Amino acid sequence: MENKKFARILALTDIFLLVLLAGGPVLKEKIEEARKREIYLEQEQSREEGQENGPEREEADAESPGQENRKSAHRELPEVLLTLEGEGEQLKISLWQSNEGSCYFFLPGFAKGKGLILDSAPGGSVYLENMEIKEGDVLREISEEKVYELSVPGENETESLNAGLIFMYSSELPVLSLSTNSGSMELIEEDKGNEEAGGAVLYDQMGAKLYEGQAESIKGRGNSTWGLAKKPYQIRLCEDVDFFGFGKAKAWNLLANGYDETRLRNQIVLGLARELGMNYVPEGQMVDLYINDSYRGNYYLTEKIRVDEGGVAIRDMEKLTETVYSPEELEMLEPVQNEDGTRKWVETGLSGEDITGGYLLERELKSRFQTELSGFVTDQGDCYTLQSPLYASEEQVNYIADLMQEFQDAIEEKDGIHPLTGKHYSEYIDVDSFIQKYLVEEVSKNYDGGVTSSFFYKPQDSVSKKFFAGPVWDYDVVFGNCNLDKIASNPVGITRLNDHVYGTDVFVELYGKEDFYDRMIKMYEEKALPYLNALLDGKIDEMVAESRNSAEMDSIRWEELENRYQYYEEYDNDVRYLKYFIKERRDFLNKVWLEGESYHNINFVVDGEIWQITCIRDGETPDAEPIPARYSGGSLFMGWFTEDGVPYDIYKPVYEDMTFYASWQELSALEKPQEDS
């Protein structure tokens, strides 16, 4: 029943709003000023250290569940809950308080124009603008522009809450509401491997319920992103469910986009993959996520990469293993490996009559490969893990490893023909899918391209005897959103997916094959370029308009900036940079691939690893000489030299790719720079 006193105060509030509306921008400035704070970059070391340690450092960070959570994700507050009138009435929204003390109700977009019902509060009531609001009372015509005075009585003064209260409404996005059986996320966020059962309710953008059911498990996911306070999750439902027409599945991922302040890069790159015609591109939808009634932010709900009819539609060789072994028995199986550790498998005693497929492979970092059950390392040093079958037999691993080795040996030959089998490289791979994969990674200048989260699949021979590239996955550090070195954030340059310290030579070799290159250029001009043009001609602006309010709520909810890749504080500037990078990248690729301009890479190597790559137009001179460090380990930097001892010269034009190595001279104790005491 509605409280009459509150109705009177709202009438007075309407008068005040005429004055306050004019001051709306001031309120926004105050909110922004309150949430700005020192950026925490100690989560991972500086960019230079990141280059020295590489992605293995990220792996170590990802496996450190004890990292301090600075986001006030579990701030102890009086439990005050709101529900909505009409559609979405089952959804409950809890009160949240920032580090500065301001309180918020983060409301879904479909709550606009609806009454807000006080569902529960300590003692049965709260005070808003000094007027008592009881459980069951309805709040109407709430303003987003106003800071309300909230008082929640406690048993004593120290337990009482008195603070400013702001109501924020999200964009018109669907809402996913999860609950854990314990009512807490403590167990799940303690360790990525922990999981808990619970419930799941999905609402569309109008508040209509699309699904309600049980979740078999809710758990963490991701690698370096798991180290952030805003964590990515994976849910597994108790039944196959079709979300948004994506196809039926039990397992779904919730990407936090923790490194991407625009929250658009994954969505944009997956769209590029679809335009190129790739198979099995994961579908996704931006949602507002609530867990145990608490707003958790803006997430990208997407399919999990999997082998089945709705995913990667190849034969599932894991089914035989699952019919023989229980899940508990599978957990007890230990991997076995050969002497040099380049091939490993699981002794199940099973292989099946046809071992030609299907296989789902992931090219991975060496550190992550070591923790996987099945996989192999090629002679070229590429580590592949078997994601399906996960419990691969020795016979299966040897078959797929030998086939991949033959392919990589073939592309190293100038004519692309394997010296022993006589097969052309195109007999080992579906060339179009590899071109699509290359374009997705190169156009977006993905720092992780070809390094990790890089999938390939091989159907059984009766379907195809070739490897296919894909599905594509994980694109939060693309389009310049990575400052670990001076390569990824530069829109100029052809990476060939080998600019990373742990990169692969596969696409370097393919890029050098005339038939591959010509088909790649044609696909870029006909499919990739129109998509980039559409992004810049308004598509990005449309995406921003659809999610801006949600992004603003997300930014306030996760108020302390810990994203090591964040360069700008304002959301609009992050979007401007994204559009800037895409435009500059498109223009550069057009010059090289369509207009025939020639560019060359100057590689600068420090301690055996590429430290920096400078891309120079043919015939031009470099701008300056990069300096890695004046002193390193008691040695003085003496300059850059080729393997033959020729020094780097910024006054000489560049006509070809070149590589220079850092030269150091060890200093005596008297010559070493003195450190400050």
Protein language model annotation of sequence segments:
Residues 89-103, 114, 596-677:
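Secondary-structure capping and domain/repeat boundary segments
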Residues 241-242, 278-282, 295-437:
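Internal "kinase-insert"/substrate-recognition segments embedded within catalytic cores
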Residues 381-451, 458-459, 464-601, 668, ...:
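Middle-to-C-terminal accessory/interaction subdomains
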Residues 124-128, 276-288, 446:
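Short, well-structured beta-strand/strand-turn elements
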Residues 228-267, 405-428:
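Short, conserved helix/loop micro-motifs enriched in His/Cys and acidic residues
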Residues 7-14, 23-171, 668-671:
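Beta-rich interaction/scaffold domains
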Residues 196-256, 396:
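Conserved oxyanion/phosphate-binding beta-strand-loop segments in alpha/beta enzyme cores
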Residues 111-112, 140-146, 157-159, 193-195, ...:
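Extracellular interaction modules
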